[in-house]
A protein has these predicted regions:
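Active-site phosphate-binding strand-loop segment of PLP-dependent enzymes
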Residues: 114-185, 191-193, 197
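N-terminal "arm"/small-domain region of PLP-dependent enzymes with the aminotransferase-like
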Residues: 1-30, 340
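Conserved coil-to-alpha-helix start sites within the AMP-binding
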Residues: 92-98
Length: 363
């Protein structure tokens, strides 16, 4: 079976380096808030060309901390407003994005996507009072550059995929180092990257149970350990190589499968034609998803579905403003299928996956 994720292979390749990094971190005797956390935050600052980096326990908590900061700014600028701010989120993404804002007290509005799963542009980018956008880097695609990232009304989620230094970070970017991401932690981890010193100070205080403000506000305990950061620093040495390998695999599949888009039933690669893509997942759309899903798994290819439903269909979203059931995002959710995608795939496995998909549609 070609497993969907390459965690076992990556560990086998890096075992000695990871165990050595773990030993060095443990021998320091400082398991949190130590030198490896500092080193990793400095590396990430340089990688993203952003002045301030704050690590935390997960990408979801990173996004929630940004949301809590923006809510506090909203309350100062709208002292008599009885309504919380509103965040516009794409209807097709993992529920963690929505949960971060719900937990921070925001109103949530779900927005339809284009045919590649990226959120359509809303009026929020022009900065109306209390309205914000949160474009998500779904599957590794970068949100449209049409978003005015630097206007303070955009919060970016999913920046873990591309990790580039173009300066377009809006109010701040939330980054996840979940083990399935392009730059993975061995356990969990996240980060906030920003040019905003006030957001930086808020995040530093909030993640440490508000100790820096002498507990003048509430906070939480949200940290990456020294061991996590020591191990992820090992992986930073390979990230460029891994990203290039992902691009090569994606380009190969897009070439091999391109003609299937014009068949009935057909298949379309969602990364095809997307200019900036880090290929954290390789997702195809087909009206015959269930048939292809079963065929691939029966032939030793572990396919998965990301995601079988939209956020608007979840019980928690029953009162949210959202697209209708014939929207693009809902239609996508009924046909998306994820193929195994990781740098450790062999050339033979990449070719085998292509051959099996082609055989399915040529039968």
């Amino acid at each position: 079976m070609i497993q969907h994720f390459g965690l076992v292979r990556q560990y086998a390749n890096l075992k000695d380096e990871l165990l050595d990094a773990t030993d060095r971190a443990m021998r320091e005797g400082c398991l949190v808030d130590g030198p490896y956390v500092d080193q990793f935050e400095n590396w990430l600052s340089g990688r993203t060309d952003v002045q301030y980096v704050v690590t935390c326990h997960s990408g979801t908590q990173a996004l929630e901390i940004i949301a809590r900061y923006r809510y506090s700014v909203f309350q100062v600028s709208h002292p008599i407003s009885a309504m919380p701010p509103t965040i516009c989120l794409p209807n097709l993404t993992y529920p963690a994005t929505m949960n971060a804002f719900v937990n921070a007290g925001w109103n949530v509005e779900l927005v339809d996507t284009d045919r590649n799963g990226l959120m359509l542009q809303t009026g929020s980018v022009n900065g109306p009072a209390g309205n914000y956008d949160c474009p998500v880097g779904l599957y590794g695609a970068r949100p449209s550059r049409n978003y005015k990232y630097d206007n303070g009304y955009t919060i970016v989620d999913g920046a873990q995929h591309w990790l580039v230094s173009d300066g377009h970070i809006g109010s701040g970017m939330a980054i996840s180092f979940d083990p399935t991401k392009n730059l993975p932690s061995s356990g969990n981890g996240g980060a906030i990257v920003t040019h905003n010193v006030d957001l930086h100070n808020f995040a530093r205080n909030y993640k440490n149970n508000a100790k820096l403000s002498q507990h003048g506000t509430s906070g939480t305990n949200s940290k990456m350990s020294e061991q996590d950061c020591a191990q992820i620093l090992v992986r930073t040495k390979y990230i460029n190589e891994w990203q290039q390998r992902r691009r090569m695999i994606a380009e190969h599949w897009c070439r091999d499968l391109a003609h299937l888009e014009y068949q009935t039933p057909g298949l379309r690669c969602l990364s095809q034609g997307v200019k900036y893509h880090a290929h954290q997942k390789f997702v195809v759309y087909t009206s015959d998803r269930d048939g292809l899903f079963g065929y691939l798994n029966n032939n030793g290819i572990e396919a998965k579905i990301h995601y079988p439903y939209t956020l608007g269909e979840l019980p928690v979203a029953r009162d949210f403003k959202k697209p209708d059931m014939i929207s693009t995002s809902v239609m996508l959710s009924r046909g998306v299928l994820s193929l195994p995608m990781y740098p450790e795939l062999t050339d033979a496995e990449v070719e085998y996956i292509s051959e099996k998909i082609l055989a399915y549609y040529d039968k």
